[in-house]
Amino acid sequence: MLQRIYLDNNATTRIDPKVKEIMDPFLRDHYGNPSSLHQFGTETHPAIAEALDKLYKGINARDIDDVIITSCATESNNWVLKGVYFDECLKKGKNHIVTTVAEHPAVRSTCNFLESLGVEVTYLPINEHGSITAEQVKEAITEKTALVSVMWANNETGLIFPIEEIGAICKEKGVLFHTDAVQAIGKIPVDVLKANADFLSFSAHKFHGPKGIGGLYIRSGVGLTPLFHGGEHMNGRRSGTLNVPYIVGMGEAMKLAVEHLDYEKEVVGKLRDKLEEALLKIPDVMVVGDRIHRVPNTTLVSVRGIEGEAMLWDLNRSNIAASTGSACASEDLEANPVMVAIGASKELAHTAIRLSLSRFNTEAEIDKTIEVFSQAAVRLRNISSSY
């Protein structure tokens, strides 16, 4: 069987063997419902507490704060936006939300839905580097602003947004602040206190944990109407039987993610840079966005004259996995939204390819990818009518 190379880690990651190992006993032996009073239920409590402790430490949350288990970051994002709608928009008359055009569909689409209910949403434009400034946020806030929601790192470009500056402005203005940290955790340090975050979303499968489990940090003293009703789980904030093996796995994945931050910067970042520099030697290839303020694993490149989907399928034939954009929207075959947002033509935006690495990638895999990508660029341009 030919070697398979996975460079789509911003879509999902392989589960770390240590995570699988720690989950196994709770899939096999300790399967009781944690809410049950008998020993099958109560024997799971120490493992849940330990996992939550790892999550708290991973984002520097305080004991008085809440880290609520959810099914994924999409749920967490929906919960924040819709909860704020109930708590701030309907009850207090604060009918304005500030976000950006670069957000994940889980935020953008939810904001679109809230607009249909009468909420005013300001979508801040990104500049030619793919970023926004804290000053843009400050200027957008009004007396009616209920929430500012800005991602910590962009899923397409890997660009890091000025979260600490934005959080400080929101605190000064008395406006709730939410950040989607899905693409930041495990790649750069994430500290909810330094960020002045009221809410922070994350998803285990983006940092080598299991799929179908995520979390929402809620700062102490901040109310949020539940999205689900039907039980008193998670201090009454989210109903549903706790998924013990996945909670345990997510906790361990968070612990490992923090332990590997230096490796991400020093090793994964250098592999990304090696890949990027080699691809830039191909004529008419460019890197999209700021190349300095990025997470270390991500590059978004445009190969002029080649449809991103064509390059994607060519790479796939050689057992290399990449992406043309967000996995939650990639089947739509739309132009890359970040490239459109920075002002690229739709023709150019269709040429984007995202390559995202992990700590499990090797230098040999990067060398092979460079070889295959370079050959594919020549072959596809030879048959292209637009180059």
UniProtKB/Swiss-Prot annotation:
Pyridoxal 5'-phosphate binds at residues 73-74, 155, 183, 203-205, 241. Pathway: Cofactor biosynthesis; iron-sulfur cluster biosynthesis. GO terms for molecular function: 2 iron, 2 sulfur cluster binding; cysteine desulfurase activity; metal ion binding; pyridoxal phosphate binding. It catalyses: (sulfur carrier)-H + L-cysteine = (sulfur carrier)-SH + L-alanine. This is Cysteine desulfurase IscS. NCBIfam families: nifS_epsilon (TIGR03403). Master enzyme that delivers sulfur to a number of partners involved in Fe-S cluster assembly, tRNA modification or cofactor biosynthesis. Catalyzes the removal of elemental sulfur atoms from cysteine to produce alanine. Functions as a sulfur delivery protein for Fe-S cluster synthesis onto IscU, an Fe-S scaffold assembly protein, as well as other S acceptor proteins. Its cofactor is pyridoxal 5'-phosphate. One of its GO terms (cellular component) is cytoplasm. Keywords: 2Fe-2S, Cytoplasm, Iron, Iron-sulfur, Metal-binding, Pyridoxal phosphate, Transferase. The active site is at 328 (cysteine persulfide intermediate). [2Fe-2S] cluster binds at residue 328.
